[in-house]
Regions:
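Cytosolic nucleotide-utilizing catalytic cores of signal-transduction proteins
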Residues: 1-125
Length: 125
């Protein structure tokens, strides 16, 4: 019980939420249970590092676009609306992201590793 409470408190702190119920932590339970956070950081960097590096050198906003693409269930219109970007620009960015990541980003299985990587990033380890 103590470790569950500690995990929930840690998640609340690291995700800027006021209160977190351990039962509602869902997938985050697995991430917060990892004793070696360097593995999580390495995983996140391995997946998102190439996009982050591209953004830094080209001001391309690919990280924001990929996150929105995941959050909007691969809807280009959803990404366009949530990022205030033209649909054609979103399509162009997604095509480039696919090339950089060498991933078709077509299925939930293609996107899940990147969703996990964003979760890890949000944990502020």
């Amino acid at each position: 019980a103590f470790s569950s409470a500690r995990m929930a408190a840690q998640m609340a702190y690291q995700t800027d939420k006021k209160i977190i119920d351990f039962q509602q932590m869902g997938f985050f339970k697995i991430l917060f249970a990892a004793d070696d956070t360097t593995i999580l950081k390495s995983y996140e960097q391995q997946l998102l590092g190439p996009l982050e590096e591209h953004d830094q050198h080209h001001h391309s906003q690919y990280m924001e676009t990929l996150r929105s693409y995941i959050e909007n269930d691969r809807s280009l219109m959803g990404v366009a609306e949530s990022t205030f970007t033209h649909r054609n620009t979103v399509n162009y960015r997604i095509q480039n992201i696919k090339k950089i990541l060498n991933n078709p980003l077509k299925t939930a299985q293609d996107l899940f590793p990147y969703q996990v990587a964003f979760y890890i990033r949000d944990m502020k380890l």
